[in-house]
């Protein structure tokens, strides 16, 4: 026999979610599975923290650095690895971003960049300083 319980976590922005308060399983009877679902108010939304303009500019720079065709879709959630970038390409992307935005990215920060959104968020935080 197994059982589980969960509770909801609230955030400031809207989203539709279902909270599972109780789940139970019985080894004796397969039809003894119960769920009690409750709607949760809309409070959570996943969104890129960076400005839209920053994300778009980073997308353009990534496309240019990786010599991607114009029809290749690059968005905030695009990972450099999925776009075909290796570690050297990633270093070149960071250098291109530093030049384009007039910033300096520390090596420790550069190593945390895996997606366009990561880069845009870091850039906005550095430009704001």
Curated annotation (Swiss-Prot):
Its main location: plastid. Pathway: Lipid metabolism; fatty acid biosynthesis. GO terms for cellular component: chloroplast. Keywords: Chloroplast, Fatty acid biosynthesis, Fatty acid metabolism, Lipid biosynthesis, Lipid metabolism, Phosphopantetheine, Phosphoprotein, Plastid, Transit peptide. The modification O-(pantetheine 4'-phosphoryl)serine is found at residue 87. It comes from the Eukaryota. 4'-phosphopantetheine is transferred from CoA to a specific serine of apo-ACP by acpS. This modification is essential for activity because fatty acids are bound in thioester linkage to the sulfhydryl of the prosthetic group. One of its GO terms (molecular function) is phosphopantetheine binding. It is found in: Plastid, Chloroplast. Carrier of the growing fatty acid chain in fatty acid biosynthesis. PANTHER family: ACYL CARRIER PROTEIN. Belongs to the acyl carrier protein (ACP) family. This is Acyl carrier protein 2, chloroplastic. It comes from Hordeum vulgare (Barley).
């Amino acid at each position: 026999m197994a059982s589980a319980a969960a509770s909801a976590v609230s955030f400031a922005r809207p989203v539709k979610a279902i909270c599972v308060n109780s789940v139970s399983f019985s080894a004796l009877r397969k039809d003894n599975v119960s769920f009690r679902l409750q709607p949760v108010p809309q409070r959570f939304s996943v969104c890129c923290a960076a400005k839209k303009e920053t994300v778009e500019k980073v997308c353009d720079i990534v496309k240019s650095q990786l010599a991607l065709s114009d029809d290749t879709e690059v968005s905030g959630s695009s990972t450099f690895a999925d776009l075909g970038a290796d570690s050297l390409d990633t270093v070149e992307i960071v250098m291109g971003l530093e030049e384009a935005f007039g910033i300096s990215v520390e090596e420790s920060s550069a190593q945390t960049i895996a997606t366009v959104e990561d880069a845009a968020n870091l850039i906005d935080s550095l430009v704001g300083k």
